[in-house]
A protein has these predicted regions:
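Bacterial N-terminal signal peptides that target proteins for export
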Residues: 2-11
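Low-complexity, acidic/polar, glycine-enriched regions of mature
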Residues: 24-196
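Hydrophobic membrane-targeting and insertion signals
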Residues: 3, 23-24
Length: 196
């Protein structure tokens, strides 16, 4: 029994030391597109319901130094893969009078982590969203952030971030006067550690 407890304690110390070493300098995570799905939320029929368009193809990187409490994100979203779950609505969202994905196939978000918890997890990002060929400031709240211990295998960090913007600021003014202009951006993301 004591031997088992000693082994568990030793493993815990090893995990702690390994994790501390891992986050003692900036580390880079590559966004895992299989577990990363940003979405745009917009009201439908004058507020009757909320529709969510999920982006099915995303790439980018996350760099973080939890000890120094610094970091940055760089996310590219393939707007041609947006999916509202209804073919007619998805096709219209991609059309020239809304997102015009033929001319503006990607949207990007880049930013610097600006606030952290005492444990080194980011809670806010100050950045810029480029959508429909227009770039504007957009700050995100990091609602959750967690990394698994390296002893579990590959090192993976995940986060959920959110923010809102006026789509008219990006030239997406379809339905102005009939629909609300404010849109929520939700980003669920997982990144895999880039090994040296």
């Amino acid at each position: 029994m004591r031997l088992t407890q000693l082994r568990r304690a030793t493993l815990s110390v090893i995990c702690l030391l390994t994790t501390t070493a891992l986050f003692a300098e900036p580390v880079t995570y590559e966004i895992d597109p299989r577990h990363t799905f940003p979405s745009f939320e917009a009201e439908h029929q004058g507020g009757l319901s909320v529709w969510r368009g999920k982006i099915r193809s995303t790439s980018g990187t996350i760099v973080i130094d939890r000890e120094a409490q610094t970091g940055n994100v760089d996310v590219t979203m393939d707007m041609s893969t947006i999916d509202f779950g209804m073919d007619a609505m998805t096709d219209h969202a991609k059309a020239e009078d809304i997102l015009d994905v033929a001319q503006f196939p990607t949207a990007t978000y880049t930013g610097e982590m600006s606030q952290f918890t005492a444990q080194g997890g980011p809670t806010a990002i100050e950045g810029q969203l480029t959508l429909h060929g227009v770039t504007n400031p957009l700050n995100l709240r990091v609602n959750s952030f967690q990394c698994n211990p390296p002893a579990m295998g590959r090192s993976v960090c995940g986060a959920d971030a959110s923010g809102s913007f006026n789509r008219d600021d990006y030239g997406v003014d379809f339905g102005m006067g009939r629909f609300l202009m404010y849109v929520n951006l939700e980003i669920q993301v997982e990144g895999v550690l880039v090994e040296d």
